């Protein structure tokens, strides 16, 4: 009886490991920064992709409302934090994307599923997500929805991608 319960616990633990985001393929130019948990980086586990077309973009901005979603060339010219990593999603399985961060502290994050391959966001086809996972509705993500506090090693966040869902605006596919 005791060996049966130990075997059940072992099987349950093995199953949890197999479906955990830790087993996801880590993508992006900065994937090595998340390997082994060394960092400094942010690993975003992506949930709710509509499909596996196009690219996943993850952008890191300063944690100031006036800088969130500002053009990258302006932020870089002013010497402010900005980083973008992008990658094609794997054909199947769980997906995580990694982005290097300059230091511990507060930042804002924006995830984009660029399904059509254009540099400009396509409202009718692209997906978007932020760390708070609150429905985006019919407006750009708000600053407070995108803020994330990060430590000196690898910080893990889960982001549910949202797509245009008719008149109510952007929301997860399963809502």
What is each stretch, according to the model?
Residues 71-101:
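Tryptophan-paired
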């Amino acid at each position: 009886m005791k060996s049966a319960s130990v075997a059940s616990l072992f099987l349950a633990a093995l199953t949890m490991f197999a479906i955990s985001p830790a087993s996801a393929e880590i993508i992006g130019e900065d994937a090595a920064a998340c390997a082994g948990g060394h960092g400094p980086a942010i690993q975003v586990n992506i949930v709710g992709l509509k499909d596996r077309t196009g690219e996943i973009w993850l952008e890191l901005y300063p944690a100031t409302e006036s800088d969130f979603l500002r053009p990258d060339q302006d932020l870089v010219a002013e010497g402010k934090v900005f980083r973008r990593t992008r990658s094609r999603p794997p054909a199947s399985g769980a997906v995580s994307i990694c982005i290097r961060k300059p230091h511990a502290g507060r930042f804002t994050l924006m995830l984009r599923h660029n399904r059509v391959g254009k540099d400009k966001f396509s409202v009718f086809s692209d997906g978007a997500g932020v760390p708070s996972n609150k429905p985006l509705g019919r407006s750009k993500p708000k600053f407070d929805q995108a803020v994330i506090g990060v430590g000196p090693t690898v910080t893990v966040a889960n982001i549910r991608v949202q797509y245009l869902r008719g008149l109510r605006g952007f929301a997860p596919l399963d809502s």
